Amino acid sequence: MRSLICDSPPAIVRPPTTAARNEGRVIEMRSVNKPGGNYLPVIIHSGIAYVSGQLPRRGEDLLYAGKVGANVDIAAAQEAAALCADLCIAAINHAAGGEDRIVQVLQLVGYIASAPGFTQQSQVMNGASDRLIERLGERGRHARTSVGVAELPRGAPVELNMVAAVRE
């Protein structure tokens, strides 16, 4: 069994397929976010990549904050979820050597900071699922769980973690 542990992402990741579309604009994935604590951003073991939770941020800057159903609407939460999906792919790109090494996204788990009574977590997660299919085609189809929570780190509205099969 082979394990690859990625504990120090570079400042810039530039595989050939790092452009992501967001409402007609192209966003280039220039960096992999460093972890906010004593854990690894991704581990690849026996052809399976386990990506730690990703917040909608660039470096230290949180780009979305608040609770969905209170001060964050569904459209903004979907954008945040799409960004988190891009960051999951960027983490795998760094650890595995490129987006083309992703064989299949297996599972996506999304945590949505939800106002009391908000029950449309699955709608929020469609932003991430749509982004994965847009970028990876059929390789981006996955099993998914959407969980409403009271709070997330740094006040983020969305956090995603991913499991994917990768070519070693």
Which residues fall in each region the model found?
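Short, polar/acidic, helix-capping and beta-turn segments at strand->helix junctions
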Residues: 14-168
